[in-house]
């Protein structure tokens, strides 16, 4: 799974997600763009990568434009209060509306639309498909 090699701090605050991102299709021909705020885990990013490579028959090129750089911690069940913050369980990428999640090229249009549609079902945020102008 994806995670940073080194971070300044091991544990972070949860934080708030505000604002929008005005992002364009830079690398590929088709892109998957988020329409909502949310967190995408490293497992979900890996699921997107697997789906697109499977349905594209390993042809074309895939760019994943997000990286999980925020640690999410949990406390074990039925533990008493205090004694510090919990352990890091998984890593997430913070997603804002308008963020490009992934891009693909080198695949026929019908197959690339289908790949991105299936990949959008794997995510906890609403998405849409963009085309390069």
Swiss-Prot record:
GO BP, sorted A to Z: mitochondrial translation
Protein name: Large ribosomal subunit protein uL16c
Stored Pfam families: Ribosomal_L16
GO cellular component, one term: plastid
PROSITE patterns (UniProt xref): RIBOSOMAL_L16_1, RIBOSOMAL_L16_2
Domain of life: Eukaryota
InterPro entries: Ribosomal_uL16, Ribosomal_uL16_bact-type, Ribosomal_uL16_CS, Ribosomal_uL16_dom, Ribosomal_uL16_sf
Keywords assigned: Plastid, Ribonucleoprotein, Ribosomal protein
Lineage, opening ranks: Eukaryota, Discoba, Euglenozoa, Euglenida, Spirocuta
Main location: plastid
């Amino acid at each position: 799974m994806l995670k940073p090699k080194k971070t300044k701090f091991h544990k972070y605050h949860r934080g708030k997600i505000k604002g929008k991102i005005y992002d364009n299709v830079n690398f590929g021909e088709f892109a998957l763009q988020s329409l909502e705020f949310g967190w995408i885990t490293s497992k979900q990013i890996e699921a997107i990568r697997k789906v697109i490579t499977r349905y594209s028959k390993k042809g074309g090129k895939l760019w994943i434009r997000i990286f999980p750089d925020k640690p999410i911690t949990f406390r074990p069940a039925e533990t008493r209060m205090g004694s510090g913050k919990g352990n890091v369980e998984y890593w997430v990428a913070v997603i804002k509306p308008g963020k490009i999640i992934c891009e693909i090229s080198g695949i026929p249009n019908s197959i690339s639309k289908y790949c991105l549609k299936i990949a959008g079902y794997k995510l906890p945020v609403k998405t849409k498909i963009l085309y390069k102008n």
